[in-house]
């Protein structure tokens, strides 16, 4: 390129690039291929793998809320949830406790599962660590795209549906968001067909 512009080489531009390709010079200009993030993971049974995350939502009256969910990988069901104006480890831990009670109850002993989280401090802190350490259920907490190759998109999916299809056309206020969220979760779990299960709900 520069040699042609400076007149140091006398040949057609197309000829120059043809020889440059043969000699491998053009390869250096190609950008490196980025490593593609791998997709999610499909569990083979219910309560084999759970995903948890927190999503932020600002209401029409400018109040920020945090929605906490735990989603079962196999069924795609939201098995525990909460909502608060606070982002804290206690609420996060309480949702895991609730998920365990909802799913195992009297069969709580001799159970084990993988818990997939993102790398944020809301999912990785002493409160969560201490609970997992002393829990009757064996919980293997793993960070998505770090401890495992797949993402945490399973738990992010319901949030996207909630915001795009349930909340977008409504005037969500701080006084109504709890009931709106409750309706969404009940509808998502019991009425809305899940893509993975085709015509069936989680």
Language-model-derived ranges and their functions:
Residues 1-49, 129, 202:
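Basic, flexible linker segments flanking DNA-binding modules
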Residues 117-119, 125-132, 141-164, 175-182, ...:
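RNase H-like two-metal-ion nuclease catalytic core shared by retroviral integrases
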Residues 63, 81-107:
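Active-site beta-loop-alpha junctions of metal-dependent nucleic acid enzymes
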Residues 72-73:
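Short, acidic, Ser/Thr-enriched surface-loop or helix-capping motifs
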Residues 77-78:
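Hydrophobic "anchor" residues
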Residues 179-202:
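Charged, gly/pro-enriched flexible loop segments at helix/strand junctions
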Residues 47-58, 69:
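Two-metal-ion RNase H-like nuclease active-site motif
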Residues 60-66:
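Short, flexible loop/turn motifs enriched in small residues
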């Amino acid at each position: 390129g520069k040699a042609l512009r400076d007149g140091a080489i006398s040949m057609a531009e197309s000829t120059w690039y043809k020889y440059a390709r043969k000699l491998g010079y053009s390869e250096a200009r190609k950008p490196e291929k980025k490593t593609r993030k791998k997709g999610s993971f499909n569990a083979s049974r219910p309560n084999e793998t759970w995903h948890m995350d927190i999503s932020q939502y600002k209401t029409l009256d400018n109040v920020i809320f945090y929605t906490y969910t735990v989603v079962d990988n196999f069924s795609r069901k939201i098995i525990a949830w909460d909502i608060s104006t606070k982002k804290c480890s206690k609420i996060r831990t309480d949702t895991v406790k609730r998920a365990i009670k909802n799913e195992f109850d009297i069969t709580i002993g001799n159970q084990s599962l993988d818990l997939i989280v993102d790398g944020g401090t809301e999912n990785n802190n002493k409160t969560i660590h201490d609970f997992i350490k002393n829990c009757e259920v064996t919980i293997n907490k793993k960070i998505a795209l770090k401890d495992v190759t797949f993402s945490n998109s399973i738990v992010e999916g319901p949030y996207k549906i909630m915001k795009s299809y349930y909340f977008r056309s409504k005037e969500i206020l701080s006084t109504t968001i709890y009931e709106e969220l409750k309706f969404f979760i009940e509808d998502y779990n019991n009425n809305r067909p899940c893509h993975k299960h085709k015509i069936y709900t989680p």
